[in-house]
Amino acid sequence: MAEAITIARPYAVAVYRLAKEKNALADWSQMLALAAAIAADEQMRAFIDNPKVDAADLERVFLSVSGDRLNEAGTNLIKLLVEYGRLSILPEIAAAFEALKAQDEGVLEAEITAAVQPSDAEFSAIVKRLEAKFGKKVEASVKVDPEIIGGIKIVVGDTVIDASVRGQLQELAYTLKG
């Protein structure tokens, strides 16, 4: 996965620069989300990974599935990715594009992991505290994981705030080992 994102990043940067130059960030977000969803489909993934399928057939099928929802530049991106055997990294390109867009807009992505689903009020309070801490708008998603036992774990970029019971128990065990 790390290799795929490394390969995808230059494509995402190039597309982001083009989209920003043409004032078409929203259009590109939609096109990349669509293309990523198509590329991530189980049947399409098998088709993409099949060495017996030639590039022309892959390009034709992929573009026919996307219909008229890609503009000329989007179609050219698909053709380029097919030509260089990179169509399978479309989900990573889309994710990197969205990360660049969020960074440029001053928005931070946060993933909140909780043992139980937080209420709307709790979720709003967490987001407000994160926005105050980082001084930026925060878009958060919640993942429920009973394995953390209680509390929450928050990941914002490279920052991890582990206020989970499991994390505290692991820290205690580490401290006791000396």
UniProtKB/Swiss-Prot annotation:
Signal peptide: none annotated. It is a peripheral membrane protein. It is found in: Cell inner membrane. GO terms for cellular component: plasma membrane; proton-transporting ATP synthase complex. F(1)F(0) ATP synthase produces ATP from ADP in the presence of a proton or sodium gradient. F-type ATPases consist of two structural domains, F(1) containing the extramembraneous catalytic core and F(0) containing the membrane proton channel, linked together by a central stalk and a peripheral stalk. During catalysis, ATP synthesis in the catalytic domain of F(1) is coupled via a rotary mechanism of the central stalk subunits to proton translocation. HAMAP family: ATP_synth_delta_bact. This is ATP synthase subunit delta.
